[in-house]
Amino acid sequence: MGKIIGIDLGTTNSCVAIMEGGKPKVIENSEGARTTPSVIAYQEDGEILVGAPAKRQAVTNPKNTLYAVKRLIGRKFDEKEVQKDIGMMPYQIVKADNGDAWISVRDKKLAPPQISAETLRKMKKTAEDYLGEEVTEAVITVPAYFNDAQRQATKDAGRIAGLDVKRIINEPTAAALAFGLDKTGKGDRKIAVYDLGGGTFDISIIEIADVDGEMQFEVLSTNGDTFLGGEDFDQRVIDYIIDEFKKINGLDLSKDAIALQRIKASAERAKIELSSSQQTEINEPYIAMANGAPVHLTMKITRAKLESLVEELISKTLAPLSIAIKDAGVKVSDIDDIILVGGMTRMPKVQEKVKEFFGKEPRKDVNPDEAVAVGAAIQGSVLSGDRKDLLLLDVTPLSLGIETLGGVMTKMIQKNTTIPTKFSQVFSTADDNQPAVTIKVFQGEREMAVGNKALGEFNLEGIPPSARGTPQIEVTFDIDANGILHVGAKDKATGKENKITIKANSGLTEEEIQKMVQDAEANAEEDKRLKEVAEAHNHGDALVHSTRKSLTEYGDKLEAGEKEKIEAAIKDLEEALKGSDKAAIDEKSAALSAAAQKLGEKMYADMQAQQAAGAAAGDAHAAGADGQADAKAQHDDVVDADFKEVKDK
């Protein structure tokens, strides 16, 4: 069995990790970074860029550069959160035939799982490059507060990327695994995982216990907001910059897609810099034109100003904290450790608010960008059987139920129920001689079904005619370990039953997923072909360059016919290099190599002659040196004698 990799599919950044020698390892991507921007760009020539290369060209290609797509995954176009995003994003969010929110790029409609699959494919390739083998299985994380439709859509994205998703696990739970892995022997402890990422916020209360030598991670409660994160913080800064610029220059930059993209990049940079400094400067020259002259954007932003802009957003995270503590049945003072996850938790004001709430400092020994991927890799090692001393008990974040008479939401499974779980309840008909019942499934906490998220519906038909309230219809809810719901209904009198795996009454059909998988495979083939063409081009270019250089140096040693043959072969190869036919380039490269063989022989002969001449010169030099040595030796034989002059007497 191959490795099961762990992937944190983030709103802003993604990360991949594996277990190696019993220890988790975060893998660097092809750019040498440990995290990859969740940005996908669709180029005019059909090429798809993912990560840093996509982010770099966003300013010049704003309408076809997609980011924060996770905020749309598993959502309907008409949801208020999606409508809010439409006004914020430079790309076009459209309504799909099934009512889902999709994105229009270069005259094509793309589903969010299809786009997210590009990021997952990059993560898969990153792991494969490191391991040197194919990877087909993964554990992918999602925000704890993701509903059934969002979880199913994430699983679909994995399938489109060519991955068998062995488990979908909650991000705070994954972070707890990463934190608790090396905390054995420290006794039972309750931890709070505060996860404020690029697009979502989660809080989970988790108990880590040692049960008969096995580490047990039990989620006691979870809460959050799937539409609150760093993107919203960025938007506050963007709005402030646009307003200030308008006051000073009278120009509205919000309608200029390219200017908006530059401001977004500046706002994100400023937000990050203000986590470590008190003041930063935004400097975007030539942001607009006024009266034929360029206008520059220069502005200072202080940490205090940033904090005042986002104070309300930080405060919005506090209500879920209180609910999670209450639902877990614990007191704030019972929490032993607070773990911060997600890039936004680097903001000093966020840390300060968390400290105020819990009355203690959050821990700083967990990497907020990598902990989730590490936890996913740990869970992968549990699923593969490599690790047997760890048990994870997660929960369903929202209540699940069906619509009953009067539009009431009858809850079958309460929120924060440990999963996997199964629950059955008997219902009956509302009318006399009713031949069928429609089971409408909802997820949420409102008392009336209409106020909750509709997950799907199905019919149970063929109920024998009888008075209302007589038939016994048993409805069963079954949630698997991924948090995905399966619902069945059975007429106890006839034994007739109907079952479905809840796929949001929108969602992608099996046919759509298969088509997207095929498209992705075709893209992979095309990418491989383009790479091979590029390599052939590079080889051809290098061959032309080196042959030309050699021809300049040694061409005069060739016969006229040989030289002409090489020059003709160079010309043919240069012509082939203007196109993208790999076979033609390879053929002309081979022809040039063959034609240049004589040139190579002349070069080799010349080099040998030079070496021989060098050796002869060396011998002559050595002989001269020997003569000098002999002469010196002869002189060395002479004995210097002392003499005394004798004078005549």
Swiss-Prot record:
Induction, per UniProt: By stress conditions e.g. heat shock.
An example molecular function term from Gene Ontology annotations: ATP binding
Keyword Cell wall biogenesis/degradation: no
Annotated Gene3D superfamilies: 1.20.1270.10, 3.30.420.40, Actin, Chain A, domain 4, Substrate Binding Domain Of DNAk, Chain A, domain 1
Residue ranges of coiled coil: none
The UniProt record lists the keyword Phosphoprotein: yes
Positions with biased composition (Basic and acidic residues): 632-649
Keywords (A to Z) from UniProt: ATP-binding, Chaperone, Nucleotide-binding, Phosphoprotein, Stress response
Family annotation (InterPro entries): ATPase_NBD (IPR043129), Chaperone_DnaK (IPR012725), Heat_shock_70_CS (IPR018181), HSP70_C_sf (IPR029048), HSP70_peptide-bd_sf (IPR029047), Hsp_70_fam (IPR013126)
Region Disordered, annotated ranges: 608-649
Residues the record lists as Phosphothreonine modifications: 200
Sequence ranges of Low complexity compositional bias: 608-631
Transmembrane region(s): none
Family, as annotated: Belongs to the heat shock protein 70 family.
Protein role: Acts as a chaperone.
Protein name listed in UniProt: Chaperone protein DnaK
